[in-house]
Amino acid sequence: MSLFSANGPEDVTRQQEALGSEGTPSTEAPTGEEHEAPRRRVPHMGHALVFVAFTGLLLILLELVLVAMGRAPGAVHGGVAKLLHPKMQLAMLAATYLTTLLASWFFFPQLWQRKFLEGLQWRWPAARNQAGRLIALGLMLGVMVQIATNFITPPKSRPIDAFFLTQADAWLITLFGTIVAPVFEEVCFRGFLLPAFAIAYDWLSLPRTAEARSRWQTTTTLTPAALIFSAVLTSVLFALMHATQVAHLWAALLVLFTISLVLAFVRVKTGSVAASALVHGAYNGFVFLVVIIQTGGYRHLERMTQ
């Protein structure tokens, strides 16, 4: 059985009941609700597209509202992100992320016929039980990335530098980067996109036979090939999403790609999006901690360029 089931624990139980004790098809005829076929695999590609599209449209809407309010004159020509104050940019992103999560909390259960966190496989208890190891993994990942960056020539300027112009802005981006961003990005990439791409891969590679269709309808596990394909594809997208933050440096993008692969592995290994979010938050927290120490608690931000 794959470590990554497309549904919750109840579905895994139903799947196991439909199989013999040695993992072979049971010869007993299904009776009653105990042998009910598993529910549909979620989140699939349609669900992921809705989530991503809603996020993008909401972000654009907020940008247009800011332009209409006159907070960013000329933004239509120069781009909102370049003209808004860092605090306004963070507020816009935080509002987009939190609103999307809130809307998803109520919307997707109507499609999935189960609670949002169950369909997403958030599974906080699994992450909590391994919190020490997950945080340690995130910190170790941060150390390795810091070592790797010593061999990367940094760009003269990066868009993210705009968030470190004042001490207040620096603390705001730290809070956002260690709490809000990791949770949202893990929900998006490891909660929606990872299973969606894997489900699509398995469906497209499914033999068009009655036996294969029956197996698809009565199981919810994903094949290793599908998980590997999805982990690579989502990691490419993850790196590209952060490309502007690292000035599109190929070496830095490769580092981000590797980080995403580790997060995907954690997600699959633990079966918990909360677990990968914990690793992600610990990693981001370590990166910010290095800067905090370097700048004396953000009191000497000029040291970042030295």
What function would you assign to each model-found segment?
Residues 1-122, 127-128, 150, 282-306:
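N-terminal, membrane-interfacial amphipathic/helix-forming hydrophobic leader that caps
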Residues 48-49, 90-91, 131-136, 171-175, ...:
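Hydrophobic alpha-helical transmembrane segments
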Residues 61-64, 232-306:
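Functionally important transmembrane alpha-helices
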Residues 69-90, 112-184, 199-221, 225, ...:
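Juxtamembrane helix-loop-helix connectors linking adjacent transmembrane helices
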Residues 94-99, 167, 171, 175, ...:
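Membrane-embedded alpha-helical segments of multi-pass membrane proteins
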Residues 104-109, 145, 149, 177, ...:
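Structural signal for membrane-spanning alpha-helices in multi-pass inner-membrane proteins
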Residues 105, 191, 195, 261-264:
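Transmembrane alpha-helix boundary and packing residues in multipass membrane permease domains
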Residues 191-202, 288-294:
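Membrane-interfacial alpha-helical segments at the cytosolic side of multi-pass membrane proteins
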